[in-house]
Amino acid sequence: MELKGSKTEQNLMTAFAGESQARNKYTYFASKARKDGYEQIAAIFEETANNEKEHAKIWFKELNGGSIPDTPANLLSAAEGENYEWTDMYQEFAKTAKEEGFDRLAYLFEGVAQIEKEHEERYRKLLENVEGGLVFSKDGDKIWKCRNCGHIVIGKEAPKVCPICAHPQSYF
């Protein structure tokens, strides 16, 4: 059977979207509960948010043949998604908001569109770096900072292993 184009595929997309939205919503609720002085309730919202994240991951994997695609594919997908958001979605939302008299919301849609444009550019640059083998080496000297311990190295390449905490090159 072919999943593509089926009602089950639509259901998987709906389930993924619903679980993803619930995760964010529960994270916001946890923050508010904590601010309101309810640590136990915040912890329960956070636990449930993590459960929802895992549920979303199940559906996302199923939509992608059972696994999460590789990093180059993910970078391209992310860039394409950001492109749609800033060139189409938010432009249309801003136009509608203006037509309906929601000027503040139109301004916010336009502002977020500009951020999404930057996101697209960042993802495309990262993809270019991955495809060109330039993630951990550059033409000129660069500051490389270990994301684990904060150690700084200046040079053309990130060290294979951090000389301070022994974390691998992937942390630079």
Residue ranges with predicted function:
Residues 1-172:
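Non-heme di-metal
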